[in-house]
């Protein structure tokens, strides 16, 4: 009985600690406070854990810079991947902790709700992971800025890639295309963005089937049968994280990869997926991600990846660099505008942001589009090739095709 009570106490203690994690400056020394929302346990827990390490690396990086940055305090709360909880947490951050910035959020459906609350509370929401283009389309949100690729950008690169790799003349048979994505906003927007970009590029294609498994679907057998039966040329998959891992593991038991090319242009190349699959990752899949551990091969990216590994014993998922970018963006805005600056001054600083990140190749610096508050970044699409430098992954991406941002094609 005593052992059981101790176990319950430790579980509750760990939960409290996870919800009250504080990083950076002390409460007394901080000139600004940031509230970050990430899933810290369950199927999406690796994103939160990696994000926390990314925040720590951001503080390390800032300490090395010649220019002084205002000290900031970062509070990390476990969103549990629940929209209602995340909305309450934002209000608690503002009213209890006096935060001026919210950062993070993995799930796009949750991000949409958090963005609404942030606008109501008049605090800046720096999106670091979610990718629905709905947040940066239409009327600009005064308090929302995103520092990782959105689905619009990924699908723009995807359409150019498809046009080059699967070119079909106007008189040839159209490319037979299938799409499978999660049954919520991110999946819907990715499909909408892909079709819009394929049409804009003049790609001759024909949609054979569109499938919508629910988030965290355990059994993809019915969806796999539908894809195999259609005999398509290209399957575009927009699942992510554990869902994509489960899909590929189950697809390995079918003939899907034998008769169709497979692509995931936004999240498929995430190291989390590559490492989880290990030897089960097939060769020749077309994948991309918001950060790659083996591209670009710059000193900055090497430092980020190796330092992350030194701290954790594993290599980073893209969530780590997203959180890293979020803290750098907030710090840079505070440095430029000042910690006591008005909302408009901070908005101007974020709108004109130029931020050198680990994912930036030589000669390129990520920059904010002031028209929609979406950071503009280079996108690298590759194919899985044998590479055991980043174990437990047995496949990494190679055969790269690189796409620089085309600002004129971004939504206003």
Which residue ranges define each predicted feature?
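Periplasmic-binding protein-like
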Residues: 93-106, 126-128, 176-181, 231-241, ...
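Short, low-complexity disordered leader/linker segments with a strong preference
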Residues: 1-33, 412
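Extracellular/periplasmic Venus flytrap/periplasmic-binding protein
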Residues: 88, 134, 142-253, 294-303
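Extracellular/periplasmic periplasmic-binding protein-like sensory domains
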Residues: 141, 251-324, 336-338, 395-412
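Beta-alpha junction/loop-to-helix N-cap segments that form part of ligand/metal-binding clefts
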Residues: 19-25, 46-53, 61, 65-138, ...
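Immediate post-signal peptide segment of exported/extracytoplasmic ligand-binding proteins
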Residues: 19-34, 65-71, 165-175
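Segments of small-molecule ligand-sensing domains
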Residues: 310-320, 331-393, 410
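Extracytoplasmic "Venus flytrap"
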Residues: 22-31, 35-56, 77-83, 106-107, ...
């Amino acid at each position: 009985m005593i052992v059981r009570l101790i176990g319950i106490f430790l579980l509750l203690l760990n939960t409290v600690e996870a919800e009250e994690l504080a990083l950076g400056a002390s409460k007394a020394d901080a000139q600004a406070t940031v509230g970050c929302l990430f899933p810290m346990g369950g199927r999406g827990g690796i994103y939160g854990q990696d994000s926390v390490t990314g925040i720590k690396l951001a503080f390390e990086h800032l300490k090395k810079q010649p220019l002084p940055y205002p000290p900031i305090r970062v509070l990390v709360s476990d969103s549990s991947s629940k929209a209602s909880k995340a909305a309450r947490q934002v209000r608690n951050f503002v009213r209890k902790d006096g935060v001026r910035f919210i950062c993070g959020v993995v799930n796009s459906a949750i991000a949409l709700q958090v963005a609404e609350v942030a606008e109501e509370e008049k605090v800046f929401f720096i999106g670091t992971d979610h990718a629905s283009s709905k947040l940066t389309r239409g009327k600009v949100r005064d308090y929302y800025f995103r520092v990782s690729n959105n689905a619009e950008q990924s699908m723009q690169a995807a359409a150019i890639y498809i046009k080059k790799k699967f070119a079909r003349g106007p008189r040839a048979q159209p490319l037979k295309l299938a799409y499978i994505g999660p049954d919520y906003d991110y999946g819907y927007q990715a499909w909408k963005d892909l079709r819009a970009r394929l049409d804009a590029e003049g790609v001759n294609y024909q949609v054979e089937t569109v499938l919508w498994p629910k988030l965290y679907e355990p059994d993809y057998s019915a969806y796999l049968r539908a894809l195999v039966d259609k005999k398509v040329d290209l399957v575009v998959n927009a699942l992510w994280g554990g869902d994509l891992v489960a899909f590929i593991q189950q697809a390995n038991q079918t003939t899907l990869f034998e008769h169709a090319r497979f692509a995931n242009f936004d999240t498929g190349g995430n190291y989390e997926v590559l490492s989880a699959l290990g030897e089960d990752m097939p060769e020749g899949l077309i994948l991309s991600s918001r950060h790659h551990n083996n591209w670009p091969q710059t000193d900055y990216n090497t430092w980020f990846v190796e330092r992350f590994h030194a701290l954790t014993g594993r290599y980073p998922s893209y969530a780590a660099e997203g959180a890293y970018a979020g803290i750098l963006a907030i710090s840079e805005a505070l440095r430029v505008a000042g910690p006591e600056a008005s909302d408009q001054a901070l908005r101007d600083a974020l709108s004109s942001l130029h931020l050198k990140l680990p994912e930036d190749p030589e000669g390129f610096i990520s920059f904010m589009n002031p028209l929609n508050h979406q950071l503009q970044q280079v996108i690298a699409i590759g194919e899985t090739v044998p590479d055991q430098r980043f174990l437990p992954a047995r496949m990494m991406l190679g055969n790269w095709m690189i796409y620089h941002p085309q600002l004129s094609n971004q939504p206003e």
